[in-house]
């Protein structure tokens, strides 16, 4: 129960961090966002570890677990976050989000293969829906692009596109969204491997290790003159949003690490997919002129959300809500690996 609640909190704060980062990259650069959010992580996690009295837990974590946590920091906080910021800069949070939901498939496959966790028939249905959501969105966008190229309907499409000030860069956005999904799908396995059998306090110490390694990886970038000029060119409007994003993502990662210390990947990661709905809400509140809110896009997000719920809820709970045929009950309760 506690692991699920922590995962839900991680979902909401991660969504808010994405939305505030999206606002920042309108006037700042992706590298600026990366450096600010990573370097903020070390003092935030250090302060949290001191307040919780868990700083000493760093020394108690065995070396193999430290290696897993260090790899998670490099993969998630450096590579994954860079790709995430490139994606939301190019196509916005609403279009990048459903593609990034496929990270769930990576996490679940690796959890079954490497950690010995299990899937049910209901969870497999959820996987199908999580894949279907981005497919719906891509189909809608292809139809709109075809309409824009059609002289007979070009004016109507043009009028529709003019309702938003934002013009997506689709190829760049979807490539980096897919890369971030791969990184975000692999990192929970590393975190769980490093923290399994511990407690939420040790999760904070584990997050400090991951952030410290990520900060060390990013630090040499300052020796490159062009990168240094880019980072030093950061101005207040973007700095304000990047700082907010950094604080929110630190809180998100903190409770995520705490959740993964006490709950399996197949519980924590699906619950985090509820960030789809949080992203939609926060985007409307903060970035409505810089996002895509077309009906087909919202429909794809809704399908993805239903898939995430199917992956999150216990099969027994769902079957208790509605009387279903015996064949459906048997299919929903099927388990893999292991069958019934």
Language model features by range: what are they?
Residues 33-34, 96, 203-207, 268:
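Juxtamembrane helix-start motifs in multi-pass secondary transporters
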Residues 185, 305-312:
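Aromatic-anchored segments of alpha-helical transmembrane domains
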